[in-house]
Amino acid sequence: MAVTIGKVVGTLLLIGIITTVILICFAARYIQTVIIPQAHVEANFVMDQTSIIYYEDPNTGEYVEHLSLHGDENRILVDYEDIPEDMINATVAIEDRTFWEHHGVNWRRTLYGVILMFTGQDIQGGSTITQQFIKSFTGYDDVTVKRKIQEIFTALDFEKNYSKAQILEWYLNYIYLGDGCNGVATAAEHYFGKDLSELSLAECASIISITNNPTIYGPNSNVRMTNEDGEVTTGRERNKQRQELVLWTMWDQGIITEEEYQAAVAEELVFTTEVDEKEPDTIYNWYDEQLITDVMNDLMEQYGYSSLVASDMVYSGGLRIYACVDQNVQSIVESVYSDRSNLDLTSNSGQEIQSAIVIVDPEGNIVGLAGALGDKTTNRGWNYASRSRRQPGSSIKPLSVYAPALEAGLITPASVFDDYPVQVLGGSAWPLNNPQTYRGLVTVADALRVSSNPAAVRVLQMLGFENSFNFMQDNFHIDLEEGLEVNGEIKNDLGSSQLALGGLTNGVRVIDMATAYSVFPRDGLYIESRTYTQVTRIAEDGTEEVILDNTNQEPEAVLSSETTYYINDMLKDVVTGGNGATGTAAQISGMTVAGKTGSTNSNTDRWFVGYTPYYTAAVWVGYDTPERIYASGNPAVTMWEKVMSQVHEGLENKDFTQPDGLVTVQICRDSGLRASEACLNDPRGSRVQSMTLFADDVPAETCAMHVSVEVCTASPVLDSSGTAIEGLYHLAGEFCPREADESLGITEGTVQTIGILDYTRELVGGVSSPDGNYFKSFLDAQGTCDVHTTAPEPVEPAGYDPNSFDITDPSTWPPVNDPRYENFDPENPATWPTPEPEETPGAEIPDTGETTTPDTTPAPSPTPAETPGSEPFIPASQ
């Protein structure tokens, strides 16, 4: 039995050892491949040199100094030699007593932290000053096993490269000490109104006391806490308690004497109550501020710096920043956007309207931007151009629907979709248009021009949600939501409302829309937009060292030349097309302009993203807290035109690239196929449209949707109100006259051949569409002509009065079908009608009752003699 138990224990022990070895091997491999490569942190920089922004002079091509940077944050940097010894000693005593001996890690305290972790307790604590600085320096302060392991190896690597004095100097310059203070020199001035070198031992201990928890131990903390005795304590009382602990620790470690300790404890701490509320010396314009932000973000991403370190590098690290700004463009942007009268709108709740603009050139340079409307009065205010994410509405359609569908070969500009509700949603027809009308069958080109929502949804359904989603992210690099839980509901951007109508879960930034649309005038190439080309600094050997480089941005081909041509051609029509086009107010005299408007269902966000061969600009308009915008027209188009018309002054007009292989073809607007004669005879007018397509996209078939039918123009079709429907008549019956027939009294034919649509639409929610009246099924239902219901009977010719004859007036000549004058010849007077004599009333004879016989015979009247030389009148030849 004992032997058996021994074998079991031995086996378990062996398994445990093997498992441990395996885990150690895995851990070693993980540390070697994952942790160590990320362990190095570069911190060799100076913080006492002015950084300068340069811009390129377009006339010379040389970079010109634009701006020297000065930080406006509450911050004073000091060298190690200027830090009081009491401050250094107090810091080491309370934070890391073995600082001068260890190599970055206190293994005893680290092991204690591991034990706490395995017992399910908080694993915080145990960090050395080196480790604390690395957390402050990098901004990585999440408490996880991986982060702790990485912190350990980073600290070991850090102490191999930097001295203890450097580490302590950086630590004391970067620690947060409450009230917006970073660093001990800043805290000295803020809390005591003194230079750091003037602090007493007691004041040094007071400042270092804050590091443990600024919210609790900050002298100005307004947090009120109850101590173990049930007493409510203030921030200053807690700071005093912590200060005395620091002083006691220094005495306990033999750093200060008993006398120094007692004197410091007894010293009254006199805090200043003054608050520095002065305005910053320099208010940066929107472009400079965005540039500073971009450089800071790239420093943090590329070097792992915290935001605090990155900020110090930008403002006082001696950087040379080469900006992409076009000073002329930026000055125009500022002049328009600083003047609120250019867009004077106020919401029902009293909010002033806001707007932002970003302008990008063909090289991907952001040449101008404004982050808000009105005078800029502060630094680091809210920037609507790069920080706000708002729903783009219909401005998303070229990116999410039409470009990917064209690229997939699913549609051409001539393809036809129904501008008619797709379904009933919530008891109403969906989707609605703005305005809330439907047009029926439309080409893709027309759908984009008038911003048809149903057509966009139908194209998206053909394309597929995932294909659209992936195309937006992969080709246009716009972040979409894959899945976000909101109040127990999972929301994402895989749907018609999001991708076809622009109701994105998280919205989109103005800068992202400008970047995405710049692909179109750039012949399908995506280039990430940038505010700078390079950031450099002067190295110790005097050379200019590049630390951030944006010069080698490789263009990414994301659209074919065919797709970009089609999009450009259709979006030009949005601006110049008329007849429902939504962007006509963006026209610039003498310049090619294309673009797309956007508005949300509730009209809380308005967009226009437009471009020329020179620049692409995205404009958003809305309120800080979304409210309905009441304005005539689209205010985003208004702001776009106000800026871009000035930007393009003096520039020569040119068009976008036109590839080879294009042909012009006559297309039916209702079927998208080659036009037939029936398409010309549509009662609404010709439905034939001339379109330019690539040869491979020209339809081979002729329109079969239009069918020819005969109607009678004497019998108009009436609507429900009794009004004649324009151009629509009942089908011709057998008795409707095809031509004039005077023998039947018919002066002209009333039968006409028209082209009608042989198309069936399933009604949704009882919604009608104007083109539905011109469907064959509708006309068939109206029946045949209700005027000519019986065969016409012959009509006798009207009598001719020869007394009306006037040889000089052809209208008085005898009718050709009058047999009495069948020989009539205008040149032969013998054939002319002879006026019938009028009866002369006789004298009235009295009635005497007697009959009398005349006694004489009346003499004959003399015949008038013929006048010599007279001839009969012969009219001129007709």
Kindly label every feature range from the protein language model:
Residues A323-T346, I357-I359, L369-G371, D375-S388, ...:
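A penicillin-recognizing enzyme superfamily signal
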Residues G126-C324, S331, D479, E485-N487, ...:
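Non-catalytic, structured segments within soluble enzyme domains
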Residues M1-E56, F118:
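N-terminal type II signal-anchor transmembrane helix
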Residues L116-V143, N212, E277-D281, L410-S468, ...:
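Conserved catalytic neighborhood of penicillin-recognizing serine enzymes
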Residues A90-V92, D96, L245, M250, ...:
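Active-site SXXK
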Residues W100-R109, N182-A185, T257-Q262, L406-L425, ...:
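Short, well-structured active-site flanking segments
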Residues Q49-E65, I83, L199, S349-T378, ...:
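A short, well-structured edge-of-sheet supersecondary motif
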Residues V593-Q878:
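Soluble, non-transmembrane domains of envelope/secretory-pathway proteins that act on or interact
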